Amino acid sequence: MLKDYLEITKPRIIIGNIILIIGSFLFSSFPFFNVFLFFFTILGTSLVIASSCIFNNLIDIDIDTKMNRTKNRVLVKNLISPTSASIFASFIGIVGFFILGLFVNILSMFLSFIGFVIYVFFYTFFLKRKSMYSTFIGSFSGSIPSVIGHTAISNSIDLFCFLLFIIFIFWQMSHFYAIAILYINDYRKANLPFFPVVKGILKTKKHIFYYITCFIIASSMLTFLGYLSYIFLLFFSFFSFYWLYISYLSIREKDDRKFSSKLFYYSIAVVILFNFLISIDFIF
């Protein structure tokens, strides 16, 4: 039973968002690191994300039954009742907001609330079944944890926040379009109008290339505007341009699944590397 409750929180999504929080928090903390603030920022944000993921699962039960990738999810198999899941999601969400507001700051709590509303209501409830641009709107919520990592320290919105926000929008679009190509048949079964379903795989591959290009440019601005060192720029550019190169090859490749899978996994490596590098950039 506990395993089922953990599963509906989508732990892998939570871990991915924690990576974003850690990177921006450690960057913004230098030269003083507050371990308690660090702990409560991660805990509060993780609980809010977990809550939003459960509500996402609840809203998508009918869709998930149609897709091979999701047909064995806990709520689809009724291992937990929708009522129990709703109560659990509401409880951990409220606790998460409370932790952020009381132990971090009101701004970070407010940002987490915005992310929650975008993901649950605008993306999952309103747009996912209606618009091929739902992924773009959903990426707004996925960029907010990185911003929260910074506002937990600064308690203000600045240019660095804006750059992080757009950097991770570009990253997410590249990442999720690769996923959409991998599972395009599932999305067709569920009648979801995701970009590759509506516009085709080739056009999606080209858009991935454009988004990665924008990601590289936006990441470089962190150096050109004085936030990060040129060592970061040099080292990270090597890996991000290789990601762009893979994307270019995928446009010409007929084996869509092979290169989309490669793009997907490499995008994970890129985001881990990015956050690792910004967290240690003070060394340089």
Swiss-Prot record:
Main localization (coarse): membrane
Record's signal peptide: none
Catalytic activity: heme b + (2E,6E)-farnesyl diphosphate + H2O = Fe(II)-heme o + diphosphate
Gene Ontology MF, one: protoheme IX farnesyltransferase activity
InterPro entries noted in UniProt: Protohaem_IX_farnesylTrfase, UbiA_prenyltransferase, UbiA_prenylTrfase_CS, UbiA_sf
Any single Pfam family the record assigns to this protein: UbiA
CDD domains, per the entry: PT_UbiA_Cox10
GO biological process: heme O biosynthetic process
Transmembrane domains' residue ranges: 13-33, 35-55, 87-107, 108-128, 133-153, 162-182, 224-244, 264-284
Pathway in which this enzyme or protein is active: Porphyrin-containing compound metabolism; heme O biosynthesis; heme O from protoheme: step 1/1
Membrane topology annotation: Multi-pass membrane protein
EC code(s) of this entry: 2.5.1.141
Keyword terms, alphabetized: Cell membrane, Heme biosynthesis, Membrane, Transferase, Transmembrane, Transmembrane helix
Enzyme type, top EC level: transferase
Subcellular localization, as worded in the UniProt entry: Cell membrane
One GO cellular component term noted in the UniProt record for this chain: plasma membrane
Further comment: Carbon 2 of the heme B porphyrin ring is defined according to the Fischer nomenclature.
Role description: Converts heme B (protoheme IX) to heme O by substitution of the vinyl group on carbon 2 of heme B porphyrin ring with a hydroxyethyl farnesyl side group.
HAMAP family, sorted: CyoE_CtaB
Similarity remark: Belongs to the UbiA prenyltransferase family. Protoheme IX farnesyltransferase subfamily.
Protein name listed in UniProt: Protoheme IX farnesyltransferase
Source organism per UniProt: Buchnera aphidicola subsp. Schizaphis graminum (strain Sg)
Gene that this sequence comes from: cyoE
